Amino acid sequence: MNAHKERLESNLLELLQEALASLNDSELNSLSVTKVECSKGKHHALVFVLSSDHKILSKLKKAEGLIRQFVLQASGWFKCPKLSFVLDDSLEKQLRLDAIFNEIAKGKDND
């Protein structure tokens, strides 16, 4: 990945965290953005958020205009990518893997 794209994704991640924190909705401003992936043309960004509630995605979609406006004002960019929000399930996967490894370790200890 090139350095420009990495820098853009990093900046966008920070700006999105600030944008969510500035919203009046307590569910949205407590969300954590874990990762941002920009498309090759940088017109679209996939935003991974840490939440177990699927209803939060509809709230984020409704607030997308406010979030993009905040990003534009805070960054000074000419254009903000279109944001698509996705629930980040990597933590759940990691916890499942840890549980499996713990079971394997217990099985070896019992032998």
UniProtKB/Swiss-Prot annotation:
GO biological process terms held by the UniProt record: maturation of SSU-rRNA
Coiled-coil parts of chain: none
Xref: Pfam families: RBFA
Signal peptide: none
Its job: One of several proteins that assist in the late maturation steps of the functional core of the 30S ribosomal subunit. Associates with free 30S ribosomal subunits (but not with 30S subunits that are part of 70S ribosomes or polysomes). Required for efficient processing of 16S rRNA. May interact with the 5'-terminal helix region of 16S rRNA.
Subunit field text: Monomer. Binds 30S ribosomal subunits, but not 50S ribosomal subunits or 70S ribosomes.
Homology family: Belongs to the RbfA family.
Name this protein carries in UniProt: Ribosome-binding factor A
Organism: Helicobacter pylori (strain J99 / ATCC 700824) (Campylobacter pylori J99)
